[in-house]
Amino acid sequence: MKRALVPLLAVAALVAGCGSGSGSGSGGSSGGSSSVSTATAASVLKAASDATKNATSAGFDAKLGIKLGGQLAGAGAGAAMLQGPLSLELKGHAGKATSGTGKFDVDFALNYTGGSFSGEALSPDGKTLYVRMPLLMGPGWHSLPLKGLNSNGAGASGSNSSTSKGLDQLKAAGADPGKWLENLSLSTANGQDTISADLDIAQVFADISTVSQNGITAKDKLQMALVQRAIKTAHGSLSFDSSTHLPTEENIKFAMDLPPSLQTQASGLKSIDLNLDIKFSDWNKDFTVKAPAGATPFNSSGLLGGLGA
């Protein structure tokens, strides 16, 4: 089993781990930054959860940057894209339509070594997706059916419920996500509260060993130790408006230098540098999404001028 992927999954749990401590906690920082308990961080996140659970809409600007080092074996046609810096930006609005189903309008752009492409995706009702991506799909809008996005899917309550259920399952299996963080701090500045923390990789791997149904072999433990030493950065932060408690920004940084023994298993990958930054705005401000006229049903044979057939 390739354990090199485990830290990437663990970073995704960083935000969830912030709010998994027990107790209500209290207090905070009136300026600068100070260390806080998991319970205190959890109380800040609870206030944010309460503020977003009935949210009807929000704007967002998400930027993902990835740098992969090494000569990736077997990358094929994607080699040029993977051998240099890659960035993806998603910018738009998402919320609830009048009927209670989800709606969204998102512009996206992917930049990579040797090229780029951009497009737009929208849905006025959560039932039909409309996509415009000239480089890959040709001119005009294309439509394809979506499974209906209900009101929970459009807001935060469904996500919060799923996260809570996932944390409960981990705890029942013997893991404690509340201990996955270190260097936890809370700062207040310019009308924002910011929670920051590093992922405790050693504790994450210890919990992985605990909950593993098939057990951890000596070889697995060696790999996990190598991965733990290879990780240079696993940091996350969440910012909220101090008055409304609505999220304003989220950032995740992850960096890893693979040792030679892991590079072979990772198809020649030597390093990973990832940065995700999401800014939130326009909370509960309605927006209009209209189905584009003249959209044609999506046909994969039209991809890349017929190469998708």
Where in this protein do the model-derived segments appear?
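Subset-of-secretome marker
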Residues: 3, 19-309
